Swiss-Prot record:
Organism lineage string: Eukaryota, Fungi, Dikarya, Ascomycota, Saccharomycotina
InterPro entries named in the record: HOT1, TF_GCR1-like
Annotated GO CC locations: nucleus
Record localization: Nucleus
Record-linked Pfam families: GCR1_C
Amino acid composition bias (Polar residues), ranges on this chain: 355-379, 402-411, 503-528
Record region (Disordered): 1-49, 344-379, 402-546
Stretches with biased composition (Low complexity): 422-432, 490-502, 535-546
The keyword Transcription is annotated on this UniProt entry: yes
Purpose: Required for a complete transcriptional response to osmotic stress.
GO BP of this protein: positive regulation of ribosomal protein gene transcription by RNA polymerase II
Biased composition (Basic and acidic residues): 39-49, 458-474
Native source organism of the sequence: Kluyveromyces lactis (strain ATCC 8585 / CBS 2359 / DSM 70799 / NBRC 1267 / NRRL Y-1140 / WM37)
Molecular function GO labels: DNA-binding transcription factor activity, RNA polymerase II-specific; RNA polymerase II cis-regulatory region sequence-specific DNA binding
Protein known as: High-osmolarity-induced transcription protein 1
Length: 679
């Protein structure tokens, strides 16, 4: 209960507006420890609550105090005290001093020693301060001893009667040294009371603020829970979207792989079909030329066989007739040479677009039954690997036997032409040539402009060699002194002349077809690379040897031409076959290999300057053509004024990229080479 509420029960009845009463009450104890207690009676109650009522303990002397005030007032009071009245209901505290509405100074009641007992009695009996018949109001909180003391004080005041003078109301005047001390204590207590009230108000404010903060925190907590739920929902939605995107990407990747697999299978099958095409399409000029050449050669062979006496070549004539008339033998050969189709697993790694593969003509065999019976069937034209070289190698031993054994009367043994074996061997060689041609097609697609320059150089060399070979063959075939007559040392002119006449009948026919044969050989060797040039050159030398035999050339000329070719081949072997590094880790390593060389090997730049394009092995051509793009890129930058390090770093920076997670990675050297394809 606050002090303002306590003031509502304070006593009233003083004409000066005093609303409180200071009462001196005895307390049990010995004479040495007698304690006088002053209770705050502003609310008319005597309580023991020290928190709500001010209490002051003052020593009043050594003489025991009786319960009657009259005896005390006579001579037992040894010290005088001045008690401040409590703050009235209508007053205020200014400067820790009590100020009433009718007075500017605090009002007090003086209690003096025994000499002024009369004045004290008059003060107690004065009606202006307290009525002798006054009794404290009954209250449940008042203890019995306090009520008895109050009643005793009232009775003592009434018993004195009017004989004692009336005590006048005077201002508080202290007559002893302890009075100021007690006044200061009272002022301090009032100040403490005021501060306690202020502290109570501050505590109330603090409690209110704490309550408001707790409510605000509860609201914030609810908001945080709602926000957390929203964030969780958004994260779940994002995860579901990412999962769906990954599923779509995986599905697309599977579809793309299936499409690439189908394309690879189609490319491999088309390559197999091209390798096993046995007929010559009508739109292929090379095939038409080869067919005409083979027809002329067959006609020449027929004329030579008809001109030769049957007595000398009984077995050969039978075999030639069997070769020309046995269709079943050629069918068996074609069936045997047609390999079973098998999917090449390496074809998946060589995926490339071939739009023209779908427009290829169907497989046609020229030995079908569409030929007329009146015309001779040229079965050799339908053979895929049968060429002039094979026929010359097969027919050469028999003609040599005819020329060497012309004077003898011993019958020749029946030796059939091993057509299947020789053609099969050439089939394997030509199939490897066709494989090389397919690889060359792939190389040309990747090498672009670089391989075109190399092919131009190789064509120039091939043309020069073929022209020389053609002139040599023509000169040898046209020499009039190269006859078989000089070969016969025995002097049997009749036999020698007959043999010479028989073979001379075929010279004109062979001469007429020589230009066609030479043109075919030149065209076949013009579009191939160095290894094929050597094989075609050897084939041309062999065909020249066959022509020389037919026209009567000596074996010395054949040996000379063969030795020339072997010498040329030996010179080519002296050229270094350099192997480039595989799987380089950086552009800097590739450029160092080009300019300086790696591991003590010569640089690629020096090899190009010294040997041209002949230092590279076949497996290095494709690698060199791709890396040459980077060489050109760096060299072009150097021409524009930039340094080698800047150009190399530019290519390295081009490889850098970021993946879907933001991690920095590098693409491969192959990707970088492919990106520079336009250079």
């Amino acid at each position: 209960m606050s002090a303002m509420e306590n003031r509502k029960n304070s006593l009233h009845g003083s004409p000066n507006g005093l609303s409180g009463l200071n009462m001196v009450l005895p307390r049990e104890g010995d004479s040495n420890n007698g304690i006088m207690t002053t209770e705050d009676a502003r609310n008319g109650k005597l309580k023991g609550d020290k928190d709500l009522n001010m209490k002051m303990h003052v020593g009043m002397g050594t003489t025991p105090i009786n319960t009657r005030l009259g005896n005390t007032m006579n001579s037992d009071v040894a010290n005088s005290m001045s008690y401040l009245l409590e703050q009235p209901q209508s007053g205020t505290l200014i400067g820790d001093r009590l100020i009433l509405e009718t007075s500017e100074e605090p009002v007090g009641v003086n209690l003096v020693d025994g000499q002024n007992a009369r004045n004290n009695q008059q003060m107690l009996n004065n009606a202006s301060h307290m009525d002798p018949a006054f009794t404290l109001p009954a209250d449940d909180t008042m203890n019995n001893s306090a009520a008895a003391a109050a009643a005793a004080a009232a009775a003592a005041a009434a018993s004195t009667g009017p004989s004692q003078p009336t005590m006048q109301s005077t201002p508080s005047i202290s007559t002893g040294g302890s009075t100021n001390f007690q006044v200061q204590i009272a002022q301090r207590l009032a100040d403490i009371d005021q501060r306690i009230l202020r502290m109570e108000m501050l505590m109330d404010n603090v409690c209110n603020k704490i309550d408001s903060h707790s409510q605000q925190q509860s609201l914030w907590k609810n908001d945080m829970h709602q926000m957390e739920n929203k964030v969780i929902d958004v994260l779940d939605e994002i995860k579901s979207n990412i999962f769906s995107l990954k599923r779509q990407v995986s599905n697309q990747g599977d579809g793309a792989f299936a499409a690439e697999l189908i394309n690879a299978i189609s490319n491999v099958s088309n390559k197999h079909i091209r390798k096993n095409t046995y007929g010559f399409p009508a739109g292929n000029p090379q095939g038409n030329d080869m067919g005409q050449t083979m027809n002329g050669y067959n006609n020449a062979m027929q004329l030579s066989s008809m001109a030769a006496p049957m007595s000398y070549v009984p077995g050969e004539q039978v075999n030639l007739n069997q070769l020309g008339n046995s269709k079943d033998q050629i069918d068996r050969f074609l069936t045997k040479s047609a390999n079973e189709f098998m999917l090449d697993p390496s074809g998946l790694k060589k995926r490339r677009k071939n739009p023209s593969s779908s427009n290829e003509s169907p497989i046609t065999l020229s030995h079908t039954k569409t030929h007329s019976t009146s015309q001779p069937i040229n079965y050799s034209a339908s053979l895929p690997n049968l060429n002039l070289d094979a026929l010359s190698k097969v027919m050469l031993p028999q003609h040599q036997q005819l020329t060497h054994n012309g004077g003898s009367q011993h019958p020749l043994s029946d030796k059939s032409i091993k057509f299947g074996i020789s053609s099969t061997s050439h089939s394997s060689s030509n199939s490897s040539d066709s494989d090389d041609e397919e690889d060359d097609i792939d190389d040309e697609e990747d090498e672009a402009e670089d391989e075109e320059d190399e092919n131009d150089d190789s064509r120039d060399v091939n043309d020069h060699d073929n022209v020389e070979g053609r002139e040599t063959l023509t000169k040898k075939s046209m020499k009039p002194g190269n006859s078989i007559e000089g070969r016969d040392p025995s002097g049997t002119n009749g036999t020698v002349n007959s043999t010479t006449n028989n073979h001379m009948n075929t010279i004109d026919t062979a001469t007429n077809t020589s230009s066609q044969l030479q043109g075919t050989v030149i065209r076949s060797t013009a579009d191939t690379e160095n290894p094929k040039q050597e094989s075609n050159a050897s084939a041309a030398a062999t065909s020249g040897a066959a022509t020389g035999v037919a026209t009567g050339t000596t074996t010395a000329n054949i040996a000379t031409s063969a030795s020339d070719k072997l010498k040329l081949h030996g010179d080519s072997k002296k050229e270094p076959k350099f192997t480039m590094i595989k799987a380089p880790s950086s552009v800097k390593e590739i450029w160092r290999e080009y300019t300086q060389g790696i591991d003590g090997r010569p640089s690629i730049k020096s090899l190009d300057q010294k040997f041209g394009n002949k230092w590279r092995a076949n497996k290095n051509k494709k690698t060199y053509s791709r890396r040459k793009r980077m060489y050109k890129f760096i060299l072009n930058g150097i021409k524009k004024g930039k340094s080698e390090e800047e150009m190399v770093q530019m290519l390295e920076n081009k490889r850098i990229y970021k993946d879907s997670d933001g991690n920095q990675k590098k693409r491969t050297i192959g990707w970088l080479q492919q990106s520079l394809s336009g250079i």
